[in-house]
């Protein structure tokens, strides 16, 4: 499942980046063991980050496991917002944005 914010972010990506995103989303959908190369649980949060690397660019998408606390066991995952990781400060800001989106989103 995608929020409008994620769809807007995704629509602006180059095709080669979209291919990497699709590959990572397929891994999340099909694998029972997820490497932190692709997905990482955010400390002290009920959120995860999807990690996509293209050349030297690091893209992140904040995820929420809708129907289970564990993303691997979840059948529904909501992609909240995506961004190009530039700094830790920007990263914290994006997590706050994701939390606001989740709060406003009706599950």
Regions flagged by a language model, labelled:
Residues 80:
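Conserved catalytic cores of phosphodiester-cleaving nucleases, focusing on short active-site segments
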Residues 64-68:
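Short conserved beta-strand segments at catalytic cores or DNA/RNA-binding microdomains
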Residues 1-58, 69-76, 84-107:
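Basic, Lys/Arg-enriched alpha-helical interface segments
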């Amino acid at each position: 499942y995608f929020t409008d914010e994620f769809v807007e972010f995704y629509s602006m990506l180059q095709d080669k980046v979209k291919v990497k995103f699709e590959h990572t989303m397929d891994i999340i959908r099909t694998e029972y063991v997820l490497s932190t190369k692709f997905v990482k649980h955010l400390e002290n949060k009920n959120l995860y980050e999807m990690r996509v690397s293209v050349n030297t660019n690091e893209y992140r998408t904040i995820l929420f496991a809708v129907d289970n606390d564990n993303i691997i066991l979840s059948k529904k995952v909501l992609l909240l917002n995506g961004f190009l990781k530039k700094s830790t400060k920007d990263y914290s800001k994006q997590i706050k944005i994701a939390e606001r989106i989740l709060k406003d989103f009706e599950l």
